[in-house]
Curated annotation (Swiss-Prot):
CDD domains: S1_IF1 (cd04451). Belongs to the IF-1 family. It comes from the Bacteria. The keyword Transmembrane helix does not apply. GO terms for molecular function: ribosome binding; rRNA binding; translation initiation factor activity. Residues 1-72 form the S1-like domain. This is Translation initiation factor IF-1. Component of the 30S ribosomal translation pre-initiation complex which assembles on the 30S ribosome in the order IF-2 and IF-3, IF-1 and N-formylmethionyl-tRNA(fMet); mRNA recruitment can occur at any time during PIC assembly. Keywords: Cytoplasm, Initiation factor, Protein biosynthesis, RNA-binding, rRNA-binding. It comes from Pseudoalteromonas atlantica (strain T6c / ATCC BAA-1087). Its main location: cytoplasm. It is found in: Cytoplasm. NCBIfam families: infA.
């Protein structure tokens, strides 16, 4: 799947789950389960509850996503 097909949304981390998974509430009110992207994992970017993040989702499954950016 091409990168252009992904949907990017802003959200807030609600909860930390096992295996570097997070529960994220998006701007539109939906709650998704998201994991950290590989570059964030490689650079040891820490994500805590309450952080503002950018989440990338595929149009095929809107309940799962990938965290690609953490706002400062």
């Amino acid at each position: 799947m091409a990168k252009e097909d992904c949907i990017e949304m802003e959200g807030t981390v609600l909860d930390t789950l096992p295996n570097t998974m997070f529960r994220v509430e998006l701007e539109n009110g939906h709650v998704v389960t998201a994991h950290i992207s590989g570059k964030m994992r490689k650079n040891y970017i820490r994500i805590l509850t309450g952080d503002k993040v950018t989440c990338e989702m595929t149009p095929y499954d809107l309940s799962k996503g990938r965290i690609i950016y953490r706002a400062r």
